[in-house]
């Protein structure tokens, strides 16, 4: 089973989404490196994909979908004004939490955001 750190960065009922060239919108995150904790992977992936530095990291939930275990974290960041797509990421957007049904996102991401919204 693949293990992934998935990040929810929410501001004013909008969630940060990223996209690779030609890909679907998704929450920032990625696979854990050997010996890396899920929390450390979340911090690293957010920085590598968006340039954002984590101020606070809260473990929200664990969800298994399609052979992947997602460790989901909510973050607050120190440098929101420095948001930009980096490395393999070509786009970043803030999208309303209540309008994700309008986007091309995976069922896994939809499930994660739905579980997060139920906790609010």
Please give the residue ranges for each predicted region.
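Conserved N-terminal beta-strand and adjoining loop/helix that marks the start
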Residues: 1-15
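Residues that recognize and position ribonucleotide moieties
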Residues: 8, 25, 93
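Hydrophobic residues embedded in beta-strands of well-ordered beta-sheets
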Residues: 15-16, 25
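C-terminal lobe/hinge of AMP-binding adenylation domains
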Residues: 20-22
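The catalytic Nudix box helix
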Residues: 27-60
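Structural detector for helix-capping/boundary residues
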Residues: 30, 44, 95-98, 103
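Active-site-adjacent beta-strand/loop module that shapes the phosphate/pyrophosphate-binding cleft
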Residues: 63-98, 108, 112-116, 120
């Amino acid at each position: 089973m693949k293990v992934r750190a998935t990040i929810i960065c929410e501001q004013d009922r909008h969630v940060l989404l990223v996209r690779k060239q030609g890909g679907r919108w998704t929450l920032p995150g990625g696979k854990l490196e050997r010996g890396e904790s899920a929390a450390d992977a979340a911090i690293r992936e957010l920085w590598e994909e968006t340039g954002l530095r984590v101020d606070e990291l809260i473990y929200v939930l664990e969800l298994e979908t399609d052979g992947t275990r997602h460790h989901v974290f909510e973050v607050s960041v120190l440098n929101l004004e420095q948001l930009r797509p980096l490395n393999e990421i070509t786009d970043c957007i803030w999208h309303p939490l209540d309008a994700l049904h309008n986007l091309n996102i995976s069922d896994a991401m939809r499930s994660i955001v739905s579980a997060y919204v139920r906790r609010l």
